[in-house]
A protein has these predicted regions:
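Internal nucleotide-binding/catalytic subdomain
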Residues: 62-185
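Residues at or immediately preceding the N-termini of alpha-helices
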Residues: 14, 37, 68-73, 279-281
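Active-site "cap" helix and flanking loop/linker of ATP-utilizing ligase/carboxylase catalytic domains
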Residues: 142-164, 171, 181-245
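Conserved N-proximal alpha/beta basic substrate-recognition cap immediately N-terminal to
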Residues: 1-48, 57-58
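A structural signal for short, well-ordered beta-strand elements
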Residues: 10, 33, 65, 69, ...
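Short, charged, surface-exposed secondary-structure boundary motifs
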Residues: 9-16, 127-129, 260-261
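Peripheral (often C-terminal) accessory segments that flank ATP-dependent C-N-forming ligase machineries
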Residues: 204-323
């Protein structure tokens, strides 16, 4: 069967992930476990700058930074109200910031094994993504080390799935795994689903525990997140040029009487425009062109998003991550 199996705990149970990382010999950054809103309040009052992450239940809380208590207090008041009787038992993982750049592996994992062709890239948080195809042996050392050390756990847990990592690398060159995605995350799945041309073969073989090698359709991919405030609570009608349908990925997509819509999912992000190319510049240019070609009510995107990802590429080189 295709899917993450029990390996989903590595993404959902962040406290368990820390334990697995330690056992696997991966570095673990300074962090605290806070059980209940009151324990979290007391810790955040004296610890500005830390990052707060939810545990187990996606949607209860999105990761946020505790800039200072004055700013954070209303958020916790609201969270306590929404959690109701669970507010005293909900667990939070609170992490100290780690200096460096965040890079990730994006591809598949079949019982702890990885295809010989891979993609890695940089995300502009909630705005865009840049990815590059390489031979697995040419992946940055930090990404290969994380995969190698997690592989036994993923094999034991039955992972046959899409798989991505967010790994922070800084001056000490150590690979700090921040979060794995044991699924087709967003981004970068909108991009890599087209960057490789034979996912049907990979999924079919992977479901049987066999490895079909990924076949690249291009050398680079770029992705730009599309959003609309209107789409939070309304069906968003989209005018997508027929020739670009392959490059516009819509969440909650439906077609009614020949027209394209994004169904309301309670969030402003409605999908992404992607671009492929034999050079990074070609991929970025194509993504921008495709994003500009789509029309929808209050539809917008960050035209500078990929500049941030490009800056991360240069910063990564300072820490031994060649692009």
């Amino acid at each position: 069967m295709w899917g993450s199996g029990h390996a989903e705990i590595l993404e959902l149970y962040r406290d368990e992930l820390k334990t697995v990382m330690k056992s696997a010999g991966l570095p673990v950054g300074p962090h605290q476990i806070a059980t209940g809103i009151e324990a979290l309040r007391e810790y955040l009052k004296d610890n500005p700058g830390v990052y707060v992450k939810g545990n187990v239940f996606r949607g209860d809380i999105e990761t946020f930074r505790n800039k200072n208590w004055v700013v954070t207090q209303p958020l916790l008041d609201d969270l306590a109200s929404r959690l109701g009787p669970r507010q005293s038992s909900t667990m939070f993982v609170v992490e100290d910031p780690i200096e460096g750049v965040e890079v990730g592996y994006d591809g598949a994992c079949i019982d702890g094994r990885f295809p010989t062709v891979a993609c890695f890239g940089y995300e502009a948080k909630d705005a865009g993504y840049l990815g590059k195809v390489v031979k697995y042996e040419d992946l940055p050392q930090a990404l290969r080390e994380v995969n190698a050390r997690l592989a036994p756990a993923m094999a034991a847990l039955g992972c046959r799935s899409f798989y991505s990592t967010e790994v922070r690398v800084g001056p000490d060159r150590k690979p700090y795994l921040m979060d794995p995605a044991m699924r087709a995350g967003s981004p970068p799945s909108e991009a890599y689903i087209e960057l490789f041309a034979n996912w049907d073969e990979v999924i079919w073989a992977g479901a049987e525990g066999e490895m079909a090698e990924l076949r690249p359709a291009a050398a680079y991919a770029a992705e730009i997140i599309l959003r609309s405030e209107w789409a939070r609570e309304h069906f968003l009608a989209l005018d997508i040029p027929p020739s670009l349908r392959r490059f516009i990925k819509v969440h909650g997509h439906c077609r009614i009487e020949g027209r394209d819509y994004a169904a309301p999912l309670g969030i402003s992000e409605i999908g992404a425009a992607i671009g492929l190319g034999d050079s990074l510049q070609d991929a970025v240019g194509a993504a921008l062109e495709h994003a500009q070609a789509v029309e929808g009510l209050e539809l917008e995107f960050d035209r500078d998003a990929l500049n941030s990802a490009m800056a991360s590429i240069e910063q990564g080189r300072e820490f031994g991550i060649e692009w």
